[in-house]
Design a protein with these regions (language model features):
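Catalytic lumenal/periplasmic loop and adjoining terminal transmembrane helix
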Residues: 1-172
């Protein structure tokens, strides 16, 4: 739902930051722009990653009917050194680096899916769209070792599996 909304409302090639999970589970699956995919391939090659990882990126890149984006991952404490993963960030850096959109995935009932409170405070007032699966008073129950956001009980409080996705548009001028 969120990926489809982004593809319909955000121009191809736009710079999008995804916050704040180390896992890609739960984030909208967006296609990389050709330039972003080439940059990642080059950096992964220098880091010694195999052809399998390259092929994964190429498969994403080949979905030509879908728009591609320059994706940045916002992850505090990440020390990977990749240009697309930022461990230090705030609204000023996002503006300086011309990030137009921020996509935040979070889920209050799972430890691995929390937003960054300092960035969340800075993004107040920039919200454009939210996809929230929580609909009722029932609290969903999860297998703590499962990263797929599929409840095992407490379904009365859910409209769908997955985290809450919030999309923000930042004024980069």
């Amino acid at each position: 739902m969120a990926a489809r909304w982004i593809e319909q409302h955000v121009a191809a090639g736009a710079k999008i930051a995804r916050c704040c999970s180390r896992s890609l589970y739960g984030h909208p699956q967006l296609r990389l722009s050709l330039g972003a995919a080439e940059q990642r391939k080059a950096e992964l090659s220098r880091a010694g990653y195999s052809y399998r990882r390259w092929r994964y990126l190429q498969a994403i890149e080949e979905q030509a009917s879908r728009p591609g984006y320059d994706l940045v991952e916002l992850i505090r404490g990440d020390d990977s050194g990749y240009s697309w993963t930022w461990s230090q960030y705030d609204l000023n850096r996002l503006r300086r680096e011309r990030v137009e959109w921020v996509v935040v995935q979070e889920y209050p009932h799972l430890n691995y899916s929390h937003s960054d409170p300092s960035l969340a405070a800075q993004l107040q007032g920039y919200a454009v769209k939210t996809f929230d699966p929580l609909t009722g008073a029932a609290t969903p129950v999860y297998d703590r070792n499962d990263a797929f956001y599929l409840a095992v009980a407490g379904f009365g409080g859910l409209s769908r599996p997955g985290p809450k996705i919030s999309i923000y548009r930042i004024d980069t001028q």
